[in-house]
Regions:
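Bacterial N-terminal signal peptides that target proteins for export
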Residues: 1-9
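Short, glycine-/small- and polar/acidic-enriched structural segments
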Residues: 24-162, 166, 173-183, 198-200, ...
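Phosphate-coordinating loops and pocket residues in cytosolic domains that bind phosphorylated ligands
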Residues: 125, 191, 313
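Secondary-structure end/capping motifs
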Residues: 220-301
Length: 318
């Protein structure tokens, strides 16, 4: 081997080592909540799946109503939230792009009512606890009301996050007739039927779908990291299938639940693998985004429609 060949090989090796080191140093801060659907993100971090793909991930628990502010300030670069929330953020000047789907709710989000309320239309003139406008619980409330001939103007909305909203129902708080919440907090209400009942969930109204996205700047500067985030998530979904006990224990611990309790709450949603992602973004995502955007405009959460064609970039799920 000539000296030139040795130098060439050394250069290739050093470049490869540098590339690995650079990938391992790719830092990304992600904003999520304790929602069951987001848990594979936590699993991917805690089980070292993100790290194996060259990511240094920091997860921050941020209420949905504040997550876009954290993105705008640069505190986080990526987040998980519902499909319609990305519409709100972009319409309000917080540029973000969805890159993969996390989950679909199959009864994991719902409306809880006090005894005596027989149907959703009975809520006219009543008080409902829900997160602030621009969040999934508020959107779910608006969606369910619309499907039953009402609007948010027909009820009084008091702003409570999903966990305290569920707790208010369980405690029988006076002045709260209904509440919008989701798993794992919805199961706490299921266990207390005397406090109220679940009158509707996303089994009745299939409209909660969560996706993961980042700022356009982060995606442009870190395309490999974006791909690693998607692949790390798919690794986590695969791990849930191959080592369920360990996976549920890790995910449950993050929300102070046993693995068994967390597994119970997960039965009301479905995490989406790569094949499901590709199918979702082939048509359903755009169709739902249009319907959701129209409702958001109608209820005054947004003042103008963002460019719906720029809400997602599907190259990272291939």
């Amino acid at each position: 081997m000539t000296p030139i060949h040795k130098l060439a090989i050394a250069a290739v090796l050093s470049t490869g080592i540098a590339s690995v080191a650079q990938a391992q140093d790719t830092k990304v801060a992600i904003g999520i909540s304790g929602w069951t659907g987001f848990a594979p993100i936590t699993l991917a971090k805690e089980a070292g799946l993100f790290q194996k793909r060259g990511l240094d991930v920091t997860i921050k628990k941020i209420p949905q109503k504040d997550r876009h502010l954290a993105i705008a300030s640069g505190d986080i670069q990526c987040a998980a939230t519902t499909v319609e929330t990305w519409i709100v953020w972009n319409a309000n000047g917080v540029a973000t792009t969805q890159i993969f789907q996390l989950d679909k709710s199959y009864g994991a989000d719902g409306m809880v009512v006090k005894p005596g309320i027989a149907k959703i239309s009975d809520l006219k003139g009543k008080t409902v606890a829900a997160s602030a406008p621009g969040t999934a619980p508020y959107f779910t409330l608006a969606w369910m009301l619309k499907k039953n001939g009402l609007t948010t103007k027909d009820v009084t909305v008091v702003n409570l996050e999903p966990q305290p909203a569920a707790n208010a129902m369980i405690a029988g708080t006076s002045g709260v007739d209904a509440a919008m919440t989701y798993e794992p907090y919805l199961s706490a209400v299921r266990a207390k039927p005397e406090a109220g009942r679940i009158i509707a969930t996303t089994l009745d109204y299939p409209m909660i779908m969560d996706t993961f996205g980042c700022t356009p700047q982060f995606l442009a500067q870190n395309p490999r990291a974006a791909k690693a985030l998607a692949d790390g998530y798919f690794d986590a979904v695969a791990m849930i299938g191959s080592d369920a006990k360990k996976s549920f224990e890790i995910m449950g611990a993050d929300v102070k639940q046993s693995g068994e309790a967390f597994e119970g709450s997960s039965k009301y949603l479905r995490w989406q693998d790569r094949a499901a992602n590709q199918k979702f973004f082939a048509g359903e995502h755009a169709q739902f985004s249009k319907e959701a955007a129209d409702l958001l405009l109608e209820i005054g959460v947004i003042k103008q429609l963002p460019d719906l064609s720029k809400l997602a970039d599907t190259q990272f799920i291939r």
